[in-house]
Amino acid sequence: MPYKISRAAYAGMFGPTTGDKVRLADTELFIEIEKDFTTYGEEVKFGGGKVIRDGMGQSQVTRADGAVDTVITNAVIVDHSGIYKADIGLKNGRIAAIGKAGNPDMQPGVNIIVGPGTEAIAGEGKIVTAGGMDSHIHFIAPQQIEEALMSGMTCMLGGGTGPAHGTLATTCTPGPWHIARMIEAADAFPMNLAFAGKGNASLPGALTEMVLAGATSLKLHEDWGTTPGAIDCCLSVADDYDVQVMIHTDTLNESGFVEDTIGAIKGRTIHAFHTEGAGGGHAPDIIKICGQPNVIPSSTNPTRPYTVNTIAEHLDMLMVCHHLSPSIPEDIAFAESRIRKETIAAEDILHDIGAFSIISSDSQAMGRVGEVAIRTWQTADKMKRQRGRLKEENGDNDNFRVRRYIAKYTINPAIAHGLSHEIGSVETGKRADLVLWNPAFFGVKPDMVLLGGSIAAAPMGDPNASIPTPQPVHYRPMFASYGKSLTNSSVTFVSQASLDAGLKGRLGVAKELVAVKNTRGGISKASMIHNDLTPEIEVDPETYDVRANGELLTCEPATVLPMAQRYFLF
C-alpha cells in the first residue's frame, strides 16, 4: 500500500504539486500548479540520503548514450504556455527535455536520463522562468549589462555607442563602423546581445549598409527626424532584409500627426516604443496606435505602474535625457506635453486587457535596466487590486494574468524581433537561458541565472567562508561569465544578410552569431501571445481622456507598491 504524506510535508520535501498555490513575492498574485509531471513516489532529489545516487535515481548511462548535462529537479515552471511542475533536462546549452527525470533502468516514465555526468540543480520550492528579454536598450554604459543579468534578463536589444549624446537620447548604433565595434565588444559580456542601427534616412543606401554590418533592427527616433519619408524608407529596407523597425514618433507633430504616421507605415509590421507617449511620440494621442493590427505596442518601465510619484519624476528625467534646458520655455513646454496622467493611467489598463504587448526598460534614458521584471509584476498587482480577477481566469488563481504579464518580457519581444526560435520560453529545443526564483523574491531577486545551460550569476556569500551562505551575500558573476565559457554560453544576434556577407570572418569575434528571422509580414499584433487585443482608441485632445471601444480607461495612482522598499533594505 502506498505511503500517504500531507500536502504540507510533500511541498516541504519536493515543492508544491498539482492544486497547490504559490504567492508571488509580496503581491496579491497567486498561481496554482496546473499539472505535475512527476510520478508520485519516484521523484528525484539530490542530497545526502536522497534519490540521485548511483544505482538509485542516477543511472549508468553515458552522455553519449543520452544522459543530460544538467537536471533541474521538481521546479515550478511559470511560462506563457502554462504553470506546471516538472524536471528540466539541459544538454549542449539547450533545453533537452521537460518532464520526469531519473534512472530509466528502475524508474517508470523517465524522459530525462540522469547519469554520472549529470549535474543537479535543486528546483524544489523554486520557480523557473525563461530569461527575460529587454528590447529597449540604450547602450550608454557597459555596466548596465551586469545590472540586467542580475535582475533576470538574459537578452538585451537596442542601440548605442556609450555615453555619446546621440546614445543618451536614442537607441541607435549609427553606421557600419560603430556596429562593428559594438559586436566586437559583445564578446566581453555574459549576455545575449543584439544591436539596432539608425533608421532615420530618406534614401535606403545608408540603412542597407547598417543591416549588412549586422544590425538586427532599425530604430526611427524623433531626435533624428521621424518624418513620413524616413518611416517609409526604413520599413522598405526592413522588408527587403527581414529586420524589425522600432519607432519613436514626432512628439511636436512637426512633420505630421499620428494619422500621418499610420499612413506612412502602410500596414507594415512595426514595434512602437513607449506607445503611451511619456517616453516620446505624437502628443497627446500616440496611444491610439495600439489599436492598429500591424503595430506591436510596448511600454518602458518608468510609467509602470501609474503611481503618485510618476508625473513628478518624469519631468526632470525627460529634461536630462533629451538635452533640454529648464531656462528655455519651449523646452519646458516640450517636456510637459509628453507627461499626461490620463494616458499613463490608461496604459495600466491597456496592459491588463492585453492591448499593450511588451514591457522594456529604456535603460538610463528614461528607464531602469534592472527593473523590467519588477515593474511588470507591480503593474499586474496594481491591476488585480483595482480591477479584480480577469474574466479569462479558470479557478481561484491568477494564472492567466501571470501568463499574460510574463509574456510581456519573454516570448513577445522575442517574437517581435525574430528571436523566438532561440529564446523567450521554457521550451524543448530552445537555449537554456533560465532563471530560478525563490517565490518570496519572485521578480525581484533571482536565485540563479543560467546562460546557455551554465550558471552566469547568483547571490553568493563570503568566498572565504566555510560555506556559501555567510554575509556579505550579494550578486556575483559565476563561471559562465568568464573566459571561453562566456563566449560559448551567450550569442550575438545579427541579420541574416550580414552573415551571408561574411560578417563572422570579417570581425573574427568569438561568440556565435545567430540570425534573426520572421520579423516582417509573418508577424503582427496577432502574434503577441495573450497580448493581441486591438481596441479602437480615442483620446480627447482637451482633457487627454482615453477611451477603448467607447469605454473610459482610468484608474487611481498607486500610493504603495509591492516588490519595493522591503526588498532593498540592504
Curated annotation (Swiss-Prot):
Its EC number is 3.5.1.5. Its cofactor is Ni cation. This is Urease subunit alpha. GO terms for molecular function: nickel cation binding; urease activity. The modification N6-carboxylysine is found at residue 219. Ni(2+) 1 binds at residues 136, 138, 219, 362. The lineage of its organism: Bacteria, Pseudomonadati, Pseudomonadota, Alphaproteobacteria, Hyphomicrobiales. It is an enzyme of class 3 (hydrolase). GO terms for biological process: urea catabolic process. One of its GO terms (cellular component) is cytoplasm. Substrate binds at residue 221. Keywords: Cytoplasm, Hydrolase, Metal-binding, Nickel. It comes from Rhizobium etli (strain ATCC 51251 / DSM 11541 / JCM 21823 / NBRC 15573 / CFN 42). It holds the Pfam family Amidohydro_1. InterPro entries: Amidohydro-rel (IPR006680), Metal-dep_hydrolase_composite (IPR011059), Metal_Hydrolase (IPR032466), Urease_alpha_N_dom (IPR011612), Urease_alpha_subunit (IPR050112), Urease_AS (IPR017950), Urease_asu (IPR005848), Urease_asu_c (IPR017951). NCBIfam families: PRK13206.1, PRK13207.1, urease_alph. Ni(2+) 2 binds at residues 219, 248, 274.
